Amino acid sequence: MLHIICFHLFNDYSGSPKVLKMILEELLKKGYQVDLISSKGGVLDELLHYKNLRKHSCSYRFSNNPAITILRYSTVQIYTFLLAFRWLFHKDVVFHINTLLPVGPALAGRIMGKHVVYHYHENAFVKGAFYKALATIMQKLAHEIICVSEYQASFLQRKKGVTVVPNALPKNFVNRLTPNLQTAFERKQILMLGSLKLYKGPLEFIELAQRLSQFTFELVVNDTQENINRFVKEHKINICKNLTIYPQQNDVAPFYNQASLVLNLSDRKQFVETFGLTVLEAMTAGLPVIVPTEGGIAEMVVD
């Protein structure tokens, strides 16, 4: 049976680790041995009760200071590159590289002659030179590339060994959703889930709340309360009575069950969604969504 060695740097509650958790959970239930190399404190930690999973922790997180982020990134690449060689003499090993970031272990895998599979969640070609370089390296190192949308795959020069597999939702999440169109309409509650990155539209969402006092607005941020407070202070935001901002949540199903409409306000001039897991979650909950007109996210929505 195959032995899966999975590398994912930043373990939080965003889309890519959620999808990875679902994949690994199915593999673990089928009896596969999985070694997971990732940071602490996110959704992937919910897999630790499986006896056939071994977790190797690496220290990695983002910083508001780009120089510190680059230093942390470089350090974790060296660490994971060297760590990967512990499986040098293991047979039937597959290196699963989740997102573009773990380039160090991908390189180590190719040096050792292991089968390297990338699960590509980003769209590097609408980002900066750094991500474009990582995407170029991915196309050289990967035996297989899994994309999450046709839009995303269309930017790759390489076509061989590229598969499009749209993201899905775990059954235990879907089972907690309780769609009720009538009560949802009556609530007049607007929901958005995302990060504090400006291109994700948090300021625009807050402005909508200020202008539309007849609606209730909820913003669920994939970040700590401390960083939310800093963001509010930095941008001199006045939190109006009809707006509630929540920090990182382990379970977002209750928010969908109380919502009437879900927004994705990503600025397509600065950032194009490759998929949009929150939109899939919202539609599964029977909720209408408003999304950008470009990118993988637009493949899911019909006017």
Show the residue positions of the predicted features.
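Short N-terminal targeting/anchoring amphipathic segment
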Residues: 5, 73, 84-102, 117
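A conserved mid-protein helix/loop that constitutes part of the nucleotide-sugar donor-binding site
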Residues: 14-25, 188, 195-211, 277
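Glycosyltransferase donor-sugar binding loop
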Residues: 36-43, 169, 193, 217-231
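An aromatic- and histidine-rich active-site surface loop
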Residues: 43-44, 76-80, 94-112, 127-128
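Nucleotide-activated donor-binding/catalytic signature segment of Leloir-type glycosyltransferases, i.e.
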Residues: 230-249
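Acidic donor-binding loop of glycosyltransferase active sites
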Residues: 257-272, 287-288
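Short hydrophobic beta-strand element within catalytic cores of glycosyltransferases
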Residues: 264, 279, 284, 288-291, ...
